[in-house]
Design a protein with these regions (language model features):
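Cap/lid segment of the alpha/beta-hydrolase catalytic domain
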Residues: 64-120, 176-180
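Short beta-strand/loop motif that positions the catalytic acidic residue
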Residues: 208-209, 214-217
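Acidic catalytic loop of the alpha/beta-hydrolase fold
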Residues: 219-224, 250
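Short beta-strand element of the alpha/beta-hydrolase
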Residues: 44, 54-65
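C-terminal catalytic histidine-bearing segment of alpha/beta-hydrolase fold enzymes
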Residues: 234-272
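Primarily recognizes the serine-hydrolase "nucleophile elbow" in alpha/beta-hydrolase
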Residues: 123-183, 187
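N-terminal cap/lid segment of alpha/beta-hydrolase-fold proteins
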Residues: 9-52
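Short alpha-helix in the alpha/beta-hydrolase fold that links the catalytic acid
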Residues: 225-233
Length: 272
């Protein structure tokens, strides 16, 4: 497919509207809304360290797990606060799948189009992050879990602004998720696989090179079995690392510690 399919209007005003902010221990947490793509507004948090910068930046994109209280932009609040103490600015965004009923509302007939729109929204989020005072575009980490990891790969394959990626429990192909529901059979399933193949992360992850990638997987993940995870990792170019945890799809505190240390090294952050 033509990369022009991913075009978006990066010159459109972000129309940032502050909601509130609070400061403690030299760190400011701001809440805002902004103009995403396709006439949608999204909510976000920004963690700002004290000082004038330049600040390394991190874009956090949450997972989808309707039963989990952190299946939204709050997922990485504690991690982002810790990163601010290390000198990094972070943006934590609302997504299409912040709606807990999103998966059941969607259909295979619309998944390709909606996926293109999601990539455009992630690019707008990057615009917002890099528009923050003091943001350093040369030290930019992308952190995504589940759909956040998968769509982050597609985004990075067409817009290489992040300088490193931490990809958490992503599965290599969108039909791995989207064929769960609603049920379709036979030729419809194969036609859907062919349509989504143009977006599948496993065929786009090599496009993130030369940015370093950390892949994180749980050995007991019912959605991302070991063979899928290993195939995803194998498709990426160097530099890359893979880390396994005795956990399910939500990963673990050990995974968070590993990820923080890895980002700290790649963004050249200071210890808190």
């Amino acid at each position: 497919m033509s990369e022009a399919a991913f075009d978006y209007d990066g010159s459109a005003p972000l129309d940032v509207r502050p909601v509130g902010s609070r400061s403690a221990d030299g760190i400011t947490l701001s809440e805002l809304t902004y103009a995403a793509s396709f006439e949608r507004r999204r909510a976000a948090y920004v963690f700002q360290p004290e000082g004038d910068g330049p600040f390394p930046v991190i874009l956090y994109v949450h997972w989808y797990e309707p039963s989990a209280p952190d299946s939204n932009r709050t997922q990485f609040l504690d991690e982002a606060r810790g990163m601010a103490a290390r000198g990094a600015m972070s943006l934590l965004i609302e997504t299409a799948w912040s709606d807990r009923e999103w998966f059941l509302k969607r259909t295979q007939a619309n998944d390709f189009r909606v996926s293109i729109e999601i990539v455009a929204e992630l690019r707008r989020a990057m615009d917002l992050l890099l528009d923050q005072p003091g943001a350093d575009p040369d030290r930019f980490a992308y952190v995504g879990h589940d759909f956040g990891a998968m769509y982050g790969v597609v985004m990075g394959s067409v817009d290489p602004r992040p300088t490193c990626y931490a990809l958490m429990a992503g599965t290599p192909r969108f039909p791995d998720w989207f064929l769960y529901y609603p049920p379709i059979k036979g030729n419809q399933r194969e036609a859907f696989r062919r349509e989504m193949a143009e977006l599948d992360p496993i065929d786009r992850v090599s496009g993130l090179s030369p940015a370093p990638i950390l892949f994180q997987f749980g050995r007991d993940d019912p959605h991302v079995p070991v063979e899928r995870a290993e195939a995803f990792f194998a498709a990426a170019d160097e530099p890359k690392e893979i880390a396994w945890y005795e956990s399910g799809h939500g990963l673990s505190e050990e995974a968070a510690r590993t990820r923080v240390a890895w980002i700290e090294r790649n963004l050249n952050l200071h210890s808190p």
